[in-house]
Amino acid sequence: MESKGVVTLDSAGLAQKGGATWSHITSARDQDTLHATRVDAAAADLVLGCDPVVTASKETMLRMHASRTHVALNGHSAPTAAFVQNTDWQNPAQACAAQIAAAVAPGELQTFDAEQVATQLLGNSLFVNPVVLGFAWQKGWIPLSEASLLRAFELNGVQVKANQTAFAWG
């Protein structure tokens, strides 16, 4: 897109709800300058936090740096496996958000209930990811044009209009 180089790495866990998923995306003006598949420690410019527990995990927090990282965070958190075994379980979303806020500069963590937006406007929480992407794009945190991102949904070919709508609502 936009003649930029890009390297991606997707990794998925195997826990409840399919497990945590991380996607490392690195872009540059020149493909030849990209050598690593993972975002280095303290090198993330942006974290799209679609789940607060995963976003506050060691794997994700390691990538953040107070002087450079923006975080768009879905504030909704579903019960984890701990809910089944602990009758005193409390939703950790607020604690996770506080931990993330401590890792970035003031104002660089923006939290909203992306699941509520996706469910109310599109009828399905599966659209949380493009809602969070759209939110971050509207903040100016994604260095791609709207046209390029909408084209990416077309190239993906999966529920194109719904994903584009979710992005627009973000």
Regions found by a protein language model. Give the residues of each.
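Active-site cofactor/cluster-binding pocket
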Residues: M1-W169
